[in-house]
Every structure is written in C-alpha cells, then in structure tokens.
Amino acid sequence: MAKVYYNGDANEKYLQSKTVAIIGYGSQGHAHAQNLRDSGVNVIVGLRKGKSWEQAEKDGFAVYSVREATKQADIVMVLLPDEKQPNVYKEEIEPELQPGNALVFAHGFNIHFNQIVPPEHVDVFLVAPKGPGHLVRRTYTEGAGVPALIAVYQDVTGEAKQTALAYAKAIGATRAGVLETTFKEETETDLFGEQAVLCGGLTSLIKAGFETLVEAGYQPEVAYFECLHEMKLIVDLLYEGGLSWMRHSISDTAQWGDFISGPRIINDAVKAEMKKVLHDIQTGKFAKGWILENQANRPEFNAINRRENEHLIEIVGRELRSMMPFVKEKQKEVVVSSAKN
C-alpha cells in the first residue's frame, strides 16, 4: 500500500527564506499562490500581459514576466496548460534557472513525454492536488485540504522530497493526505482515468443511454433526467463512501439492476478497449497525437467540440437547467475556441 504523508511529515523550513514563482494564474495557479501566501511563503506570479495579470495584481501579488519571475525565484511552479508549457519553458524559464533551483509541476505530462528536458543542475518534482483549484482554495480556507500526489524526478540538492512535502503542506494537501508516486505513474494513470472513466468513458456512457431512450420513443427531457441529471446524486454517494455506500443508499431494485445489468454494459469487450487506451498512453501514441494536433492548430479537436456542443442532450439540458433555479447555470452560451486560456 502507498505511504500517506500528513502535516507532521512535512517541515516548513524547506520553504523558509525562499521565493516561489507561480507561473500561470488560472484554476490551480490562483489557489496555489493564495494558499502559499497564507502559509507564510514569499510568493510572486509570472505571467504574460492580460486579464490574469490584472487579476493577480488585484489579489495583491507582485506580478512579473515569466522570465523575470523565474530569475527571482528559488522554486518555480509551472501551472500553465500542458500544451503551452514547452514553448514558455524553452523561451522564458530555462534560461533563468540557477543551480539548486526547483522546477515543479502539477502534472507530469511534459516531463514524462520529454517535451520539457530539465537541466541537470535543478531539482524537479511534482505536487499534484487531486481536485480543481477552487476546491484547493476553499478547503484550505476552511481548515481542511485536498489530497495530493508528490513525485521526485531529479534530486540535485538532496532535499527535493522534503521540499515537495513542504510545498504540499503549504497549500493544505497534507491536511488531507499526500501519496508518493512517480512522474510515470501520475501521468499515465491520470490520462487513463480521464479518457476511460471520468471524462471519455462517462460522457460516452451518458450519451449512449440518452440516445437509447430517445431512439426508443421516450421524451428527450425524461431521458436527460434519467441519464445525466441524476448522475450527481450517484456520484456524491460514491464520493462519500465508495461503491458499497452508494449501493446501500439506493433502492433494492436499483441495486439488483446494478448487479445484473452493469456487467452487460461494461463487459470484457469494454475492458479490452480500456487496455488498448492504456497501451496508447503507455507507448506515447496518445501524447504524440495530442502534440501534433496542437501543432496543427487543433482542427479535429475544434470540429469534434463543435459537434458535441450541438448534440441533442446539450440542447435539452440547457432548456431544462434554465427552468431549475436550484441549478446554477454554468454555461450561458457555448463559445468554441481553439483554447481555454
């Protein structure tokens, strides 16, 4: 079993008298910066000019160009989107890294797939909260935290692991528990979870169920409720207590249906496809395709995104959510762009 680290296992001294540069001020960036500052760490933010720069200054941070922030920092946490990191690293971060600095990531993609090759004179480690930035920030302010993974790729100073734990503690992660992993394990399992279960698997399952009911003559609105809207109720139960708690909480009829019908849907053929997905991740085939897609300015990504946003389940969903005051509408208008930020 994996070892779990808590507050008592981390020592803040590894961050004392050091400056941490947060590169990027999006979902994770704002949470890391504010949590670190509230933990007494000296934090600066590195950005390119734009709305994020203005927001970081509004939040009280000293903001610099990425290159200048790297130059001033002892620890550089790169929290830009995966596809933007290599160019920014090569042009603005790498030239300013000094011996003994720490280069830090929240996801191992670019290190593991050799899109970023760090110099030999710096520590390289990972601190990856297992939750979105707003949750990392909110739980911290409530005195709790979000679990995280740490991994060391390169330890020049002999203190990389201790610094990673200190960083994890400063953002609140050791309050919940921190697991040690490797860049390989974090990257491959994270991509697999997204593709086969949490995002790709789930959205395809929801759409297939919705389409099955609509094609059988049932009202799209009813199909939406049964296949998408109620998902939150089940996921909340799973989050609280795993599969057994969810099954304990639903009706016996639903549980019996789970037992006898679930394996018909997610069967050995599906598991075989999951293994193929994992193989594509492990061999770098997925990474190569995604890198090439970005280099070509995302033609397939954008086309699929537009098509998915026009699916009947999206149209029906927007109409139904507008009728539910207890559901905060997250998406007033779908705007398909080549990048989120």
Curated annotation (Swiss-Prot):
Cofactor(s) for this UniProt protein: Mg(2+)
Cofactor remark from the record: Binds 2 magnesium ions per subunit.
GO BP term, pick one: isoleucine biosynthetic process
Top-level taxon of origin: Bacteria
InterPro entries membership: 6-PGluconate_DH-like_C_sf (IPR008927), KARI (IPR013023), KARI_C (IPR000506), KARI_N (IPR013116), KARI_prok (IPR014359), NAD(P)-bd_dom_sf (IPR036291)
Keyword Amino-acid biosynthesis: yes
SUPFAM superfamilies: 6-phosphogluconate dehydrogenase C-terminal domain-like, NAD(P)-binding Rossmann-fold domains
Active-site residue list: H107
This enzyme's EC code(s): 1.1.1.86
List of residues binding NADP(+): Y25, G26, S27, Q28, R48, S52, D82, E83, K84, Q85, G133
Annotated binding of Mg(2+) 2, by residue: D190, E226, E230
Catalytic activities: (2R)-2,3-dihydroxy-3-methylbutanoate + NADP(+) = (2S)-2-acetolactate + NADPH + H(+); (2R,3R)-2,3-dihydroxy-3-methylpentanoate + NADP(+) = (S)-2-ethyl-2-hydroxy-3-oxobutanoate + NADPH + H(+)
Domain KARI N-terminal Rossmann: 2-181
One Pfam family here: KARI_N
Entries under HAMAP family matching the protein: IlvC
Similarity-based family: Belongs to the ketol-acid reductoisomerase family.
Record function comment: Involved in the biosynthesis of branched-chain amino acids (BCAA). Catalyzes an alkyl-migration followed by a ketol-acid reduction of (S)-2-acetolactate (S2AL) to yield (R)-2,3-dihydroxy-isovalerate. In the isomerase reaction, S2AL is rearranged via a Mg-dependent methyl migration to produce 3-hydroxy-3-methyl-2-ketobutyrate (HMKB). In the reductase reaction, this 2-ketoacid undergoes a metal-dependent reduction by NADPH to yield (R)-2,3-dihydroxy-isovalerate.
Protein name per Swiss-Prot or TrEMBL: Ketol-acid reductoisomerase (NADP(+))
